[in-house]
Amino acid sequence: MSCRSEHIWIEPITGARKTSNFCWAVILFLGSLGFLLVGTSSYLGRNLISLFPSQEIVFFPQGIVMSFYGIAGLFISSYLWCTISWNVGSGYDRFDRKDGIVCIFRWGFPGKNRRVFLQFLIKDIQSVRIEVKEGIYARRVLYMDIRGQGAIPLTRTDENFTPREMEQKAAELAYFLRVPIEVF
């Protein structure tokens, strides 16, 4: 949901707080917890989970491997939960024709570069570019070519826009910024 007036266009960017990330984090957490409990129950020789009798799983080597997978899965799951809680990748793109400035803001991982803030003059924008890669994993990305800076992506690579939606978005942005469109 973008906010747009005659002179200012603000485009919010979704970060890590997507439904798919929540689903993967929950599935990974529950699966790795299950692996860890099965490995622990094979070590203790008692049934911590009633689905698998501990006598059928020998601790060496199956129990050790399942415990390792459980611990590794918990680490990956905690990484996913941290990116979700920090909302990594979220932010906004602000195009201000009145002041002639484009601001791109994104949240990153905690640390020195937690806030990523880029600022350009509109007169330095050469074009709005659509890059299309067809095939099994088709991908369409919208870029902004900045003189002396190169191309800056404006859409995420995991956003699946239809060709019409991507063309519409590029045309609206190019019209707003008064720059040409390039397609690669």
UniProtKB/Swiss-Prot annotation:
Family under the similarity heading: Belongs to the Ycf4 family.
Location (main, coarse): plastid
A Gene Ontology BP annotation from the UniProt entry: photosynthesis
Membrane topology: Multi-pass membrane protein
Function: Seems to be required for the assembly of the photosystem I complex.
Cited InterPro entries: PSI_Ycf4_assembly
Source species, domain of life: Eukaryota
Record Pfam families: Ycf4
Protein name: Photosystem I assembly protein Ycf4
Annotated localization: Plastid, Chloroplast thylakoid membrane
Keyword hit for Thylakoid: yes
Organism: Lactuca sativa (Garden lettuce)
TM ranges: 22-42, 57-77
